[in-house]
Amino acid sequence: MSPHLPQFTNISRIYPFTHTPIECYFNTSPRDFVIKEIPLYEPSGSGEHLLLYVRKKGLSTFELLNILSSSLGCRVRDIGYAGLKDKAATSYQYLSIHRSLQNRLESALPHLHSQHIKILTITPHNHKLKIGHLKGNSFFMRLKKVSSNNATKLHSTLELLAHSGFPNYFGNQRFGKEGDNFQSGKAISEHKLTLKNKKISNFLISSYQSHLFNAWLSSRIQLAQILRSFKPNEVLRALQSPNFPTLHTFAKSCTPQLIKTLQSQKQPFVILQGDIMCHYPFGKNFVCDDTLIESTRFLQKDIAPTGALCGTKFTHSKCLAYDIEEQFLDSQIKANGTRRYAWVWAENIEGRYIPQEAHFELHFHLPKGSYATIFLESLLSTHNC
């Protein structure tokens, strides 16, 4: 792990797609942006807990939890939830509370409704809901000021993304209003900042982990772009360019034969020996030994590469892949580490153009942890969603 990380302060999310930007207007408002949680399982119908299906508008999940805990007279940590939902949206998500709070909940319904919170269903369940206990999320997005020409581009690009997938960056929501939460997380990891609120401290550290993941993913896509853009005898010089410092160590291992082998891969994210792959959409991690075999399985959506959310107790990549990944690992992070899909696919994609209103309505499903705004950036070829 690199003891002296480069200053990855201004990370631009890089996308491998070559289509021209598509002009339209998207407003992250509760009317034009709707998120619905796809549960991992159905309520059991009995037990000591209650599973609540909740609709919230204009509230973050943390704000929702604070309002609910205050209304019920319980601690925030007593409320279970599967994932965080965007504040600037209408969100439907599941929460859990202990069954002993049912009477308080029913009394609090009018107050909750005044706070833009509506409890849609209440069902007995046999355990508390935990983080990650969801299959994914379904999304609705309404794009505005869409010309007929751009609507045609949207339809064709949706077909491209359905086939190719897109990079699984963390979205802007992960990094706060000013986009600098990760800097506080870095300071906490370096023992330069201490917060009394453990939950906020952990969230800031996770923002720093996410920042390093995004920086690594951008670097890997830069590698793929170089391999696509240059002739075999020009690739090495490009990799050694001052513009790509995180690829210099990798360049030292490159041979003409390796470059030709990597250029033969057809998918937009190039697989390297030593990459940690994972069966898709869920399954076990394993080390890539044969890039020819695994890149074919990647094209078929059977597996996908993963990137590090560095910390303790995680598996780092090997060989060539580690030459790049090592530069984005910080050994000072003491939070648990893990691997995250670097590449994902949207499912059940539907696009409908309404010419009289110049609106384009999008429906799609994403795996848990993936951001609709990143899918939209891939679709529109922009970096501002």
UniProtKB/Swiss-Prot annotation:
Active site: D86 (nucleophile)
InterPro entries in the cross-refs: PsdUridine_synth_cat_dom_sf, PsdUridine_synth_TruD, PsdUridine_synth_TruD_CS, PsdUridine_synth_TruD_insert, TruD_catalytic, TruD_pseudoU_synthase
Keywords for the protein's UniProt record, in alphabetical order: Isomerase, tRNA processing
Gene Ontology cellular component terms for the protein in this record: cytosol
Molecular function GO labels: RNA binding; tRNA pseudouridine(13) synthase activity
EC numbers on record: 5.4.99.27
Domain TRUD: 165-305
Reactions accelerated catalytically: uridine(13) in tRNA = pseudouridine(13) in tRNA
Pfam families found in the cross-reference section: TruD
Biological-process GO terms, alphabetical: tRNA pseudouridine synthesis
Domain of life: Bacteria
Claim: Acyltransferase is one of the keywords in the record: no
Coiled-coil positions: none
Job description of the protein: Responsible for synthesis of pseudouridine from uracil-13 in transfer RNAs.
Similarity comment: family membership: Belongs to the pseudouridine synthase TruD family.
UniProt xrefs under HAMAP family: TruD
The protein's name: tRNA pseudouridine synthase D
Organism annotation: Helicobacter hepaticus (strain ATCC 51449 / 3B1)
Name of the coding gene: truD
